[in-house]
From Swiss-Prot:
The gene is ftsZ. It is found in: Cytoplasm. This is Cell division protein FtsZ. The keyword Transferase does not apply. It comes from Methanothermobacter thermautotrophicus (strain ATCC 29096 / DSM 1053 / JCM 10044 / NBRC 100330 / Delta H). Essential cell division protein that forms a contractile ring structure (Z ring) at the future cell division site. The regulation of the ring assembly controls the timing and the location of cell division. One of the functions of the FtsZ ring is to recruit other cell division proteins to the septum to produce a new cell wall between the dividing cells. Binds GTP and shows GTPase activity. Residues 7-17 have a biased composition (Basic and acidic residues).
Length: 381
């Protein structure tokens, strides 16, 4: 181990290059190459929830991405914070919003297709964030995703499903919108809002919406900065594309820990997250973002990856990155995006057949639960 200790001491003594070295011709040339080759990433937040996400990203910062707020409601758009803003459907809605009707939101996006194309020009990767169930986000997100994908960008939609408290109508709107979104984007990361209440059941609804916005923002920031921010283990755009291109549905799990065996605790928390409440054994692949302060070790990161790999098919493609964030102060944070999953929120191309299959599986489970309960009662009496 002596050679390792010697190497550490030498690295600590090593000085940064002088300013004259940094300003050399070769460094300027390298900097120019890096700037020109950097993936162009846009985060489009459409509708109320989408605008909240880009506003939150503007507050916490997302390195290497531009934010674009899109809305049919001029007032909501005015109060949003983003690098760029786009009011869609001026003739259809007149800046007054879509009235909670997805068909109106879709019509507004179609009216403004040329404007949307201009905003997305030259993008390598586009995130489209929205809350499903209302008018603008549900209606416009599939149109925006389709235009981004047609322009050649890797297109990742990140969408929330509504709380049950929002009513059956919004739920039905959300399910129809999700089906359209799946057809339009490369990957759709679904965040079921009801699952947030399993973590904090007594959370007031307004606070629950804020938590949903935070999770949307963290998901987008985590994936983006795996590409744009240098790390302990860095990824490039091609790495992320290999997982997310044409992957269909995806779910996300998050966990963090600071005491004991923090690496294992954080990954188990992420895998057991209510947001990732489904069988992932047949998933196509996983994207793992590991963050920690300067005491994060490569061994800890590798243990996290090994645990995730054990849960997936041996042929699944796993890409991971590790980043140092000093503000975490002894905390390890693990974010897992599992792509190519069968989601309970959409039934895919075979619709009713798959729905019947899932319902039959649930009936079998209920039957087993009832028989176990009967045995328990018989044993007691």
């Amino acid at each position: 181990m002596k050679f390792i200790n010697d190497a550490i001491k030498e690295s600590e003594k090593r000085e940064k290059p002088s300013s004259s070295s940094m300003n050399s011709e070769i460094d300027r040339e390298l900097r120019e190459i890096i700037e020109n080759s950097r993936a162009k990433i846009y985060v489009v937040g459409t509708g109320g929830a989408g605008n909240n996400t880009v506003t939150r990203l503007s507050e916490i910062g997302v390195e290497g991405a531009e934010t674009i707020a899109v809305n049919t409601d001029a007032q909501d758009l005015f109060y949003s914070v983003a690098n760029r803003k786009l009011l869609i459907g001026k003739n259809v809605c007149g800046g007054l919003g879509a009235g909670g009707v997805p068909e109106v939101g879709e019509e507004c996006a179609e009216e403004s297709e040329d404007d949307i194309r201009r905003e997305l020009e030259g993008a390598d990767m586009v995130f489209v964030t929205c809350g499903l169930g209302g008018g603008t986000g549900t209606g416009s997100a599939p149109v925006i995703s389709k235009l981004a994908k047609k322009a050649g960008a890797l297109t990742i939609a990140v969408a929330t499903m509504p709380f049950s408290a929002e009513g059956l109508k919004r739920r039905e709107n959300a399910e129809r919108g999700l089906e359209k979104l799946q057809s339009a984007a490369d990957t759709v990361i679904v965040i079921p809002n009801d699952k947030l209440l399993e973590v904090a059941p007594n959370l007031p609804l307004n606070k629950a919406f804020m938590v949903a916005d935070e999770i949307l923002g963290r998901a987008v920031k985590g994936i983006t900065e795996l590409i744009t921010k240098p790390g302990l283990v860095s990824l490039d755009f091609a790495d992320v594309r290999s997982i997310m291109k044409g992957s269909g549905m995806a779910m996300i799990g998050m966990g963090e820990a600071e005491s004991g065996d923090r690496a294992l605790e954080s990954v188990y928390e992420a895998l057991n997250s209510p947001l990732l409440d489904l069988d992932i054994s047949n998933a196509r692949g996983a994207l793992i973002n590991i963050s920690g302060s300067s005491d994060l070790t490569l061994q800890e990161a590798e243990r996290i990856v090994e645990v995730v790999a054990e849960e997936l098919d041996p042929d699944a493609n796993i890409i991971w990155g590790a980043q140092i964030q000093d503000e975490l102060q002894n905390v390890i944070r693990t974010t897992i995006v599992v792509a190519g999953v069968r989601s309970p929120y959409i039934y895919g191309a075979h619709g009713s057949a798959e729905k019947e299959f899932l319902e039959e599986k649930q009936r079998e489970k209920d039957s087993v639960d009832e028989s176990v309960l009967e045995e328990f009662i018989d044993g007691v009496f």
